[in-house]
């Protein structure tokens, strides 16, 4: 699969575009890119036009402007949809891409027909708290600069990116993402090369920590209530061996979305159903979008 490029505003977005039919737009997670969707694209492209983009600062997309919120990335996706004249799309989001997609659904309801959320970020964000003796204090960071020095969740990954440390990044993924199955050697080499292209980790971690679409407070502040602006049907996967996005985050999303949402429990599956159960995932995506 070869990437194409299109300009949106001040950024150039790289993307994969495979197959024909109704458009399925795929939004990737943190430490990844469009290429991580290849197992799903391969299984869906005979029926759908599968488009997966590299978000700003990921993969081969530009990073001309920093960002503070997932709203800004959702705005990029909306501009991308318009630039390619896609019309309303079937949307897939994975991990952080689930958070970006929730924002897209809330801000641009006319652009999304249905949303399939794969182990997506919770509507109350993914907190990174201050540390004392390498233990979380539950206190929020006051700035990106302070968060960048977090000795557990942020700084080690920054050093991996700076060094292009393939071995350490692979070990991180093996320990946290691939908790059930492992990718092939060829897949891992390709996907890790894409992972190491990320340049925006601090922006992304800050945006995720501050995400709050609920009506409630988190240590980072009061939510904006934007979850109530979502109008489309949403399917949520809930994998029993995911140690990145815990079950309570998926349930928070499910409960907040009410009658719009359906819950899809995945047994013996970790944070990447694309690796742990790609056939089941593709079947569920197709059935949900075909209803």
PLM feature spans:
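Acidic catalytic loop of the alpha/beta-hydrolase fold
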Residues: 216-217, 241-245
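Catalytic active-site module of serine/aspartate enzymes centered on a nucleophile-bearing elbow/loop
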Residues: 259-291
């Amino acid at each position: 699969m070869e990437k194409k490029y299109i300009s949106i505003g001040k950024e150039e977005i790289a993307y994969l575009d495979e197959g024909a039919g109704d458009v399925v737009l795929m939004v990737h997670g943190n430490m990844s890119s469009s290429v991580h969707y290849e197992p799903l694209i391969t299984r869906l492209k005979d029926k759908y036009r599968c488009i997966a983009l590299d978000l700003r600062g990921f993969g081969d997309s530009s990073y001309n402007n920093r960002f503070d919120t997932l709203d800004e990335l959702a705005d990029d996706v909306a501009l991308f949809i318009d630039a390619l004249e896609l019309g309303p799309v079937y949307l897939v989001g994975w991990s952080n891409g689930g958070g970006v997609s929730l924002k897209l659904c809330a801000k641009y309801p006319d652009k999304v027909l249905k949303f399939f959320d794969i182990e997506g970020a919770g509507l109350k964000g993914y907190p990174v708290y201050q540390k004392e003796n390498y233990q979380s204090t539950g206190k929020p960071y006051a700035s990106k600069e302070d968060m960048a020095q977090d000795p557990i969740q942020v700084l080690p990954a920054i050093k991996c990116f700076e060094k292009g440390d393939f071995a350490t990044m692979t070990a991180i993924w093996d320990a946290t993402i691939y908790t059930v199955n492992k990718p092939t050697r060829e897949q891992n080499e390709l996907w890790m090369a894409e992972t190491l292209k990320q340049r925006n980790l601090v922006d992304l971690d800050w945006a995720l920590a501050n995400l709050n679409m609920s009506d409630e407070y988190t240590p980072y502040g009061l939510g904006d209530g934007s979850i109530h602006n979502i109008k489309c049907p949403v399917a949520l996967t809930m994998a029993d061996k995911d140690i990145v996005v815990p079950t309570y985050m998926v349930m928070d999303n499910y409960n907040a979305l009410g009658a719009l949402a359906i819950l899809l429990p995945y047994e013996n599956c970790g944070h990447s159903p694309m690796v742990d159960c790609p056939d089941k995932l593709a079947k569920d995506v197709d059935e949900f979008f075909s209803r």
